[in-house]
Amino acid sequence: MIAKVSNKSNKSNKKEAVFKRLAENRYAKFQYEISETIEAGIELLGTEVKSIRNGNVNLRDGYCSFRDGEILLLNVHISPHKNVGSFFNHDPLRNRKLLLHKKEIFKLKSNTEKKGLTIIPLSIYLKGSWIKLTIGIGKGKKLHDKRQADKQKDIKREIKTALKR
């Protein structure tokens, strides 16, 4: 007897992508006024993947730059994996290629050149089994802008406490 197999996919069998945030750049939200965010993949080595999954990554000083039609993630520290010898381990501050479509790269490049914007890594997370990076396009805040943002946060906090009473 031959069983018929239908080509229709069963929605109940599909697994939903699970998001697990591994690191976040809180400093970027204070330093920059972020106008747009984009999800990008990262080209990583095996020991880097293990280290990121353990949460040993620092995005604070990171930024993105263009080279030969590609976008690179610079100055992001991914600690060497502990259980691997030094010969097989990676360089913690090496340049990592971001995986984006050509149109997205062109759009980012034109925005940064014309408007004087910066591309900053905001967070790194797991999407299913893939490691993804959220990059933000933003402009650096001046000192008075930072002070004004702090004052507004304090005012909102005072209003919330007053309403709770």
UniProtKB/Swiss-Prot annotation:
**Which Pfam families would you find in this protein's record?**
SmpB
Task: Tell me the InterPro entries matching this sequence.
Answer: SmpB (IPR023620), SsrA-bd_prot (IPR000037), SsrA-bd_prot_CS (IPR020081)
Cystine crosslinks: none
Where does the protein end up?
Cytoplasm
- Is the keyword Electron transport assigned to this protein? no
User: Which keywords label this protein?
Assistant: Cytoplasm, RNA-binding
This protein's GO cellular component annotations are: cytosol
The record ties this protein, via PROSITE patterns, to:
SSRP
Q: Main location per UniProt?
A: cytoplasm
Q: Which GO terms describe its biological process?
A: trans-translation
Look up keyword RNA-binding and say if it applies.
yes
Q: Molecular function terms in GO for this entry?
A: RNA binding
PANTHER family in the cross-refs: SSRA-BINDING PROTEIN, TMRNA-BINDING COMPONENT OF TRANS-TRANSLATION TAGGING COMPLEX
Family, according to the entry, reads as follows: Belongs to the SmpB family.
- Tell me the function of this protein: Required for rescue of stalled ribosomes mediated by trans-translation. Binds to transfer-messenger RNA (tmRNA), required for stable association of tmRNA with ribosomes. tmRNA and SmpB together mimic tRNA shape, replacing the anticodon stem-loop with SmpB. tmRNA is encoded by the ssrA gene; the 2 termini fold to resemble tRNA(Ala) and it encodes a 'tag peptide', a short internal open reading frame. During trans-translation Ala-aminoacylated tmRNA acts like a tRNA, entering the A-site of stalled ribosomes, displacing the stalled mRNA.
* Name this protein carries in UniProt: SsrA-binding protein
Organism this protein belongs to: Prochlorococcus marinus (strain MIT 9515)
